[in-house]
């Protein structure tokens, strides 16, 4: 039976009593939660008729008291859930109400569907956690403690927040889309058309790299192999453009494993189940997690050079084509030899040969792939060895004589006019005789000369004040390629014991050439100190550079002081220095490219 409460005062008294019992229960230590922030007034949505069914069947309409102010919670209308469970409590509670400490803590509540944060019923001064209702539609059934309240103007605040989030989300999505669409070529910095050969690149660089790896790519830089490659100057130097393609990571097999065709940025990509899920990259497109190598792996990745893919026959052909032209000396048969005239002829010829040597070195396969520092370093260490092996090679057909030029053929007796020259002449003649006995071939000679160039500065003296080679690993790989080419030449006659011995003997000759070079440096430096003949700019700079690489000064003076005095008065400021020749590529009638 339902009994209606006739007076407003009695209903309010019952409500106050309920609230008092409720607060006593919540004052227990286990219910005390630290206050995080103050809580404003709360209201119940007015569209729901709040009715509570009492155990005796009485009901009280709280809408009648909506105009009255509540003493504790302000304006309020409480919506207590269905009272079917209340009948089980009997009449132990006040006025037929069951005590709140005897009610099941998991009563069911009907919550309004829109998303909002709702506080639990709490005593004044106590802040309780919030929970979020975010069901898409309809009423949701949640288990909770006391009934949920709604904050005033919550709908307006939520709507404003949604609008702000939507506007910021639109801006963020536009920026993200712009970042995803704008990519630049890693080679020339033009707009990238896609992911080609392992990097983002434009159509021009993609097509250039494709032509280079499929066809003939023996490009030569006319300058220093450090040309600027950008959108406007990418066609100015093919050698530097291809070098930059390799530097940024382009490779023949560098294709995206998750490619599906079409615009790649518009497709979702998935990996195999055994490899896990994709990770989102910084631009928003999804990539395999292990597709990009780490910076450490990139740093230690082997440098890729086209020379490593050449066959032995291609290597030999390139070395033969790179040979410098034959130079003539300024010898005048009407003038007798003396120390000054002979040294003048030899130093003038050596200075001109150095210019052609620079162009020859730039055409040696793999040499231009090195940094400019390493190229200059190797030439400074090997220039006299290269001149000497060329001299003994030309002199093989002239026993007992040295063919410096087609019009300058000298024997041992003529070398006596220069102090200290006979010893060097004897070593050169002995080496030429040894090569003649071994019947050295032209292909073998060009391989040996290239090995001298690449092997000269690999083992730098620890006491040297100059910076060591930057790309030793790459130099060793190219050096191995040269050695393999020499072995290939030997194998043409059969891999017999005699051929193995011949290979060892040829390589041993290189140590004798190194010894002759050191002797020649000492003699040339003594001639310079005695002012027998003025040295030319490039030759003088190469002489000083070689002494900088030496471990100690044979004269007993500190090496560092000697070097500083030399550099203060020699080719470091000369307009015809090594760097000048290397940059301009000056050579008399000698082409820079194959």
From Swiss-Prot:
A zinc finger (NR C4-type) spans 185-205, 221-245. Its main location: nucleus. The modification Phosphotyrosine is found at residue 536. The modification Asymmetric dimethylarginine is found at residue 260. InterPro entries: Est_rcpt/est-rel_rcp, Estr_rcpt, Estr_rcpt_N, NHR-like_dom_sf, Nucl_hrmn_rcpt_lig-bd, Nuclear_hormone_rcpt_NR3, Nuclear_hrmn_rcpt, Oestrogen-typ_rcpt_final_C_dom. Residues 262-594 are annotated as: Interaction with AKAP13. CDD domains: NR_DBD_ER (cd07171), NR_LBD_ER (cd06949). The modification Phosphoserine is found at residues 104, 106, 118, 167. GO terms for cellular component: chromatin; cytoplasm; Golgi apparatus; nucleus; plasma membrane. GO terms for biological process: cellular response to estradiol stimulus; cellular response to estrogen stimulus; estrogen receptor signaling pathway; negative regulation of canonical NF-kappaB signal transduction; negative regulation of DNA-binding transcription factor activity; negative regulation of smooth muscle cell apoptotic process; nuclear receptor-mediated steroid hormone signaling pathway; phospholipase C-activating G protein-coupled receptor signaling pathway. Residues 257-269 have a biased composition (Basic residues). SMART domains: HOLI, ZnF_C4. Residues 311-594 are annotated as: Transactivation AF-2. A lipid is attached at residue 447 (S-palmitoyl cysteine). Residues 1-184 are annotated as: Modulating (transactivation AF-1). Residues 185-310 are annotated as: Mediates interaction with DNTTIP2. Composed of three domains: a modulating N-terminal domain, a DNA-binding domain and a C-terminal ligand-binding domain. The modulating domain, also known as A/B or AF-1 domain has a ligand-independent transactivation function. The C-terminus contains a ligand-dependent transactivation domain, also known as E/F or AF-2 domain which overlaps with the ligand binding domain. AF-1 and AF-2 activate transcription independently and synergistically and act in a promoter- and cell-specific manner. Nuclear hormone receptor. The steroid hormones and their receptors are involved in the regulation of eukaryotic gene expression and affect cellular proliferation and differentiation in target tissues. Ligand-dependent nuclear transactivation involves either direct homodimer binding to a palindromic estrogen response element (ERE) sequence or association with other DNA-binding transcription factors, such as AP-1/c-Jun, c-Fos, ATF-2, Sp1 and Sp3, to mediate ERE-independent signaling. Binds DNA as a homodimer. Can form a heterodimer with ESR2. Interacts with coactivator NCOA5. Interacts with PELP1, the interaction is enhanced by 17-beta-estradiol; the interaction increases ESR1 transcriptional activity. Interacts with NCOA7; the interaction is ligand-inducible. Interacts with AKAP13, CUEDC2, HEXIM1, KDM5A, MAP1S, SMARD1, and UBE1C. Interacts with MUC1; the interaction is stimulated by 7 beta-estradiol (E2) and enhances ESR1-mediated transcription. Interacts with DNTTIP2, and UIMC1. Interacts with KMT2D/MLL2. Interacts with ATAD2; the interaction is enhanced by estradiol. This is Estrogen receptor. It comes from Equus caballus (Horse). The gene is ESR1.
